[in-house]
């Protein structure tokens, strides 16, 4: 095994179970990512540059583009983990038919509610950290003069809907000082966007405004600005599965959603938003399709289209769109070594796979038709964990025979054939005539 795998730290069983079960099911684990992260140094370095900008009071907007299974969600979760460790608050949501950026039936508000439900900090990485953030702010205001609190909230009051938002913050602070749990929960309910009608909010809070489908993004900007008052560096918003906007059948509804993206893009790049970073993940089709994708909205296409100087070997990682490149053969080898160590530690067995076996496994994966352009880490990981499960449950199984039975021609030794010079196993497929 390589030094990377042999020196790997022991993974707690609970974390190992989440990693293995999530990856075998084709989804990204929300915990334990540092144990299995490989590659993506260039992309991660570019996104970490954005975090520095956010901490300085700026804002950023990025698209992560890659095929299904290429590692978009994995990279988003990796950045999420790193941002929380650096003192940022992270909110993430996956779009769906019920959750969009804009909709006539509350789909935009549903996305906001999902973001707030998943709001996370270093001490509450699993989400649901809104009350923790509010309580931290209340504690920071405990021994300061009221004029200091007013000065702290003054920049928020100048923002759109800032007066209503700061009024709720003051109400929460008063309720916390008086031990009024019911009033505190009502303010939390308001911030989460759970009041359905203005009359309901007026009856319980005396407020005639509620967070709605049209203005939820304004409150995201307010929350990002408020987080700095609570001692955090800023807010990172991660929105995945943009393909669900591409799938909207109604062209006008699609355009409204892309218009919302344009608003967010303009706000962050023009300096209208502060302490806020936005990262959206989507497939190449959902972004670049000129008929239904993001590029169908001309104002966005003209802003996001790649310039004339970037090319395949010279990527511009400071551009708004980051296109994920496939992991290299060597990076995948390191990844499956790490997975083998985690699997062995969790199930308490000694793998019989040698490094040559791991290389043979990757040869089989890369030996598929179309693997050069269509093989993704998700497929490699899923197959490898399945192989480990089989070997763990069948200790007498011969690894080489198992790989040979699946790989066949991919593992056949290259042999000169006298007429074509191709590998013997592939001779019948070297050429054909239609």
Q: Each predicted region: which residue ranges?
A:
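Conserved phosphate/pyrophosphate-binding and hydrolysis machinery centered on Walker-type P-loop NTPases
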Residues: 33, 37-41, 69, 105, ...
């Amino acid at each position: 095994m390589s030094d990377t795998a042999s020196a790997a730290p022991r993974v707690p069983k609970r974390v190992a179970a989440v990693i293995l079960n999530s990856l075998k099911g084709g989804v990204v684990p929300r915990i334990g990512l540092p144990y299995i992260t490989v590659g993506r140094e260039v992309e991660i370095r570019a996104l970490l540059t954005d975090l520095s900008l956010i901490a300085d009071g700026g804002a950023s907007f990025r698209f992560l583009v890659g095929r299904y299974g290429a590692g978009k969600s994995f990279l988003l979760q990796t950045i999420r983990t790193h941002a929380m460790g650096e003192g940022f608050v992270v909110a993430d949501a996956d779009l769906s038919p019920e959750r969009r950026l804009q909709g006539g039936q509350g789909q935009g508000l549903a996305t906001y509610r999902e973001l707030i439900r998943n709001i996370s900090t270093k001490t509450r990485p699993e989400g649901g950290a809104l009350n923790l953030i509010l309580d931290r702010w209340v504690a920071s205001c405990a021994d300061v003069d009221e004029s200091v609190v007013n000065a702290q909230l003054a920049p928020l009051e100048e923002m759109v809907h800032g007066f209503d938002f700061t009024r709720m913050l003051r109400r929460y602070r008063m309720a916390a000082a008086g031990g009024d749990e019911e009033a505190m929960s009502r303010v939390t309910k308001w911030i989460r966007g759970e009041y359905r009608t203005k009359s309901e909010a007026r009856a319980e809070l005396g407020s005639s405004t509620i967070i709605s489908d049209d203005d939820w993004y304004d409150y995201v900007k307010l929350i990002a600005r408020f987080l700095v008052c609570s001692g955090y560096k800023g807010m990172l918003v991660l929105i995945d599965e943009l393909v669900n906007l591409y799938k909207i059948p109604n062209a006008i509804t699609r355009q409204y959603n892309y218009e919302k993206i344009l608003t967010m893009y303009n706000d962050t790049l023009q300096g209208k938003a502060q302490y806020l970073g936005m990262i959206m993940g989507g497939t190449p089709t959902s972004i670049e399709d000129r008929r239904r994708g993001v590029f169908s909205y001309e104002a966005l296409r003209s802003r996001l289209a790649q310039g004339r100087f970037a090319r395949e070997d010279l990527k511009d990682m400071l551009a708004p769109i980051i296109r994920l490149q496939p992991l290299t053969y060597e990076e995948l080898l390191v990844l499956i070594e790490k997975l083998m160590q985690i699997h062995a530690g969790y199930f308490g067995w000694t793998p019989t796979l040698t490094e040559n076996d791991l290389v043979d496994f990757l040869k089989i994966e890369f030996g598929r038709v179309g693997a050069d352009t269509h093989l993704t880490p998700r497929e490699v990981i899923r197959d490898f964990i399945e192989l480990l499960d089989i070997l763990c449950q069948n200790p007498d199984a011969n690894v080489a025979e198992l790989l040979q039975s699946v790989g066949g021609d991919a593992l056949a030794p290259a042999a000169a054939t006298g007429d074509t010079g191709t590998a013997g196993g592939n001779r019948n497929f070297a050429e054909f005539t239609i």
